[in-house]
Swiss-Prot record:
The keyword Electron transport does not apply. The lineage of its organism: Eukaryota, Viridiplantae, Streptophyta, Embryophyta, Tracheophyta. InterPro entries: ABAP1/ARIA (IPR044282), ARM-like (IPR011989), ARM-type_fold (IPR016024), Armadillo (IPR000225), BTB/POZ_dom (IPR000210), SKP1/BTB/POZ_sf (IPR011333). This is ARMADILLO BTB ARABIDOPSIS PROTEIN 1. Pathway: Protein modification; protein ubiquitination. It comes from Arabidopsis thaliana (Mouse-ear cress). Transmembrane segments: none annotated. Keywords: Nucleus, Repeat, Ubl conjugation pathway. May act as a substrate-specific adapter of an E3 ubiquitin-protein ligase complex (CUL3-RBX1-BTB) which mediates the ubiquitination and subsequent proteasomal degradation of target proteins. In association with TCP24, exerts a negative role in cell proliferation in leaves, possibly by inhibiting mitotic DNA replication. The BTB/POZ domain mediates the interaction with some component of ubiquitin ligase complexes.
Length: 737
């Protein structure tokens, strides 16, 4: 199972990572969001563009104006490096000049564009050499404490390492790890020096920045003994040092199991848990980031963290004013609530659900993503499912489906999938318009679509018994908007055997038709889709979608007698041509022919009967049908043959003509087809047109004539739906989710 975790950002960065989400395969639709870089030092990055000098002079001006003479920046940096190097070869070096050079390079390094020049001019080796302890004995007299010099060198190295991985390696190759670890261990020495704590803090920052996203350097830090002093510094009196140590542990623990194990073995967890309760957002922010990285892909450490009492403080941080802390807390809650965890209910009981739902409305998209992730995990418990829905979680999660970011959509969809497992939530889903939202299909990745499909199937399997009764009650008593949403949802979700109960007995069809008649184009599309789905469910196939059966008349003389003078007792005249026929077959086929030859009409005793207004080839096909009960209807003759079949009341032939014509219905001819069906009372063709309109409503809605046409056919839609819903329907088998 792949879960990306947060990592400690180097000092340089102030922009959050935008790595694409990774969607795991367990649970099958759950997105495991990536931990983002900390923004603890984002403000510091912005300050680099400003002056850090206490006297207010602009940094660049101060650095490049030496002895009141402007000089080139490269030359200035080169001079500073030369001064730093001179102390190692000149016993009479100017100590103050060295301190000033280190401070100037540190200030220059605060501007990203300067770092490359600093590196190219050999500053890294010189800076690393000054990381040694200032308490070096010269003869029998110790040198004075020079913590500011060390602090500035450490600060410069940390800023340089933050720029690119190549600089990290240059610093390590210059031998920085060992002296940096020694600085971390300098606890209690020269406590009276004002910069002593700052040196330790900047040393921790070096660890943070050289180890960032560099597995080999993380391992080197552990091998050189760097983890133990960092753990000890978590209890340092200076809060800034605590924070820096937690940040360094956060970095070195990311995706490094050996480092994680050592941190836990050194008993860092209790102190990190205490730091979660700090009122300083920068402190609890680093602590929760470190804990998150320790927990990542480490079930045993996760249990240790919970046993150390982290659960309640983490839940409390969901209400932090720091967005990054909220995000980290939500992600950690999601990890605590993993599928194999038994503390989902405990998390809810301790008050996590309400702040998580509130976080769904955050302006920070990553906070939203992590809170949806946590709710998705918590929603795997039945009691939590009801609690999340009761606190308004369904509506907030549905709204997230409109967000275009794939990971946010997917986490929201997965949470909704969990909530749909509880029968108590079905009505809330539908009342909130959730079915329409799920069916809008505005999803950016296929796994989210798959998740939504399964959610709809899960809801569909619950539309029976008490759930159906509750929805029917609401459809009778609730406000009109809710009634319509229920009708729309049930059209897609109900069992066909309940169609009459819902849509005829409880007026569901009328709600859908009202929406089709009066509403906006979007609502009309919802209605047409619901009616089309309902029609498909109510019949295994529509009449126009299958060829009709042969007619049930008793006498078929056979095709060999078509236009055969043998035993012919009547001759039809069509287009001046003679067509030989037999009254016995004609009378048996149609009431019109029966009245013509058995009634009081003049044709009864006539030998020749003229047939006007019909073409020979059409009449011949009609006779073939009468004599044999079957014909192949050419598409170009179908309409004329339909007219003839209607005129002579040949219902079997008429049905076959309607079937043939229905195959030619398209977006361009639907008005003409419907008019043809209406003119000749071709009910099957008319219903084929109706079904086509419902199926292709969205495409047709752009036509200027369509709005009027829809209102014209609503009576036919009502008649059609009433007819098919009152037929006996076999129950559909349940869908397994």
């Amino acid at each position: 199972m792949i879960i990306s975790k947060s990592f400690k950002a180097p000092l340089k960065f102030s922009v959050k990572s935008s790595t694409a989400p990774v969607i795991s395969n367990h649970p099958p639709m759950e997105n495991h969001p990536k931990r983002q870089r900390t923004t603890r030092l984002a403000a510091r990055n912005l300050k680099r563009k400003l002056s850090h000098n206490t006297d207010g002079a602009p940094i660049v001006t101060q650095l490049i104006d030496i002895d009141d003479e402007p000089i080139d920046l490269v030359v200035a940096i080169r001079r500073h490096v030369e001064v730093l190097n001179s102390s190692f070869s000149d016993p009479d070096f100017d100590h103050e000049a060295v301190k000033e050079a280190a401070a100037d390079i540190a200030d220059l390094a605060k501007i990203d564009e300067n770092v490359e020049i600093i590196v190219e001019n050999g500053a890294i080796p010189a800076l690393v050499r000054y990381l040694e302890s200032p308490l070096v004995v010269c003869g029998n007299v110790p040198k004075s404490c020079e913590h500011k010099l060390e602090k500035d060198c450490a600060l410069a190295l940390g800023l340089i390492a933050a720029i690119q991985p190549g600089y990290q390696q240059l610093i390590v190759d210059a031998g920085a790890i060992v002296p940096t670890v020694k600085l971390l261990k300098r606890r209690g020495e020269c406590g009276e020096c004002m910069f002593a704590n700052a040196v330790i803090r900047r040393a921790a920052d070096i660890i943070t920045n050289i180890a960032h996203d560099n597995p080999r350097i993380k391992t080197n830090i552990r091998v050189e003994g760097g983890i133990a002093p960092l753990v000890e510094l978590l209890n340092f009196p200076d809060v800034k040092v605590q924070r820096a140590a937690a940040g360094a542990l956060r970095t070195v623990s990311f995706r490094n199991d050996e480092n994680k194990s050592q941190i836990v073995e050194l008993n860092a967890l209790p102190t990190l848990v205490l730091m979660l309760q700090s009122q300083d957002s920068t402190v609890h922010g680093e602590a929760i980031g470190a804990i998150g990285n320790l927990v990542h892909s480490s079930p045993d450490i996760k249990k240790e963290v919970i046993r150390a009492g982290a659960l309640q403080p983490v839940i409390g941080l969901l209400s932090s004013t720091c967005l990054e802390t909220q995000r980290e807390a939500a992600l950690l809650i999601g990890q605590f609530a993993a599928p194999d965890s038994d503390c989902k209910v405990h998390i809810a009981q301790r008050g996590a659900i309400t702040p998580l739902i509130k976080m769904l409305e955050s302006s920070d998209e990553q906070v939203v993503e992590m809170s949806a992730f946590a709710l998705g995990r918590l929603a795997q418990d039945a009691h939590n499912q009801a609690g999340i829905a009761h606190r308004g979680g369904i509506i907030s999660l549905l709204n997230l489906l409109d967000v275009k970011t794939g990971s946010v959509q997917h986490n929201a969809a997965f949470a909704l999938y969990g909530l749909a497992d509880n029968e108590e939530n079905v009505a809330d889903f539908i009342k909130a318009g959730g079915i329409q939202k799920l069916q809008d299909d505005n999803f950016t990745v296929q796994p989210t679509r798959d998740c939504v499909v399964r959610t709809l199937k899960r809801l569909q399997n619950k539309i029976h018994g008490p759930v159906l009764n509750q929805l029917l009650y609401l459809m009778r008593t609730a406000e009109k908007t809710v009634q319509i949403r229920i009708a729309l949802a049930l059209a897609h979700l109900c069992d066909p055997k309940d169609g009459k109960l819902i849509f005829i007995d409880n007026n569901g069809v009328e709600f859908l038709l009202e929406l089709l008649y009066f509403s906006s184009n979007k609502q009309q599309r919802y209605s047409s889709s619901a009616l089309y789905e309902l029609a498909k469910k109510a019949t295994s196939f529509a009449p126009e979608d299958s060829a009709p059966c042969s007619p049930t008349q008793q006498v078929f003389l056979g095709e060999k007698f078509v236009n055969n003078p043998t035993m012919s007792d009547v001759t039809f005249l069509i287009d001046g041509k003679q067509f030989y026929a037999h009254k016995i077959g004609l009378v048996a086929s149609s009431d019109i022919f029966r009245a013509m030859f058995d009634g009081l009409y003049k044709e009864r005793n006539a030998q020749n009967v003229e047939i006007p207004n019909i073409r020979w080839e059409v009449f011949e096909l009609m006779m073939k049908f009468i004599y044999s009960g079957r014909i192949n209807i050419a598409k170009h003759l179908a309409k004329d043959l339909l007219v003839a079949a209607d005129q002579y009341l040949l219902e079997g032939l008429k049905r076959q003509c309607e079937y043939t014509i229905a195959q030619e219905i398209c977006l361009d001819n639907i008005p003409e087809m419907y008019e043809l069906a209406d003119t000749f009372n071709a009910s099957a063709l008319r219903r084929a047109c109706t079904l086509f309109v419902l199926e292709h409503f969205t495409k047709l809605s752009s036509q200027l004539w369509f709005a009027k046409f829809v209102k014209q056919i609503i009576p036919e839609i009502r008649s059609y739906m009433t007819d098919i819903l009152t037929r006996p329907v076999e129950a559909s088998p349940p869908t397994v989710v």
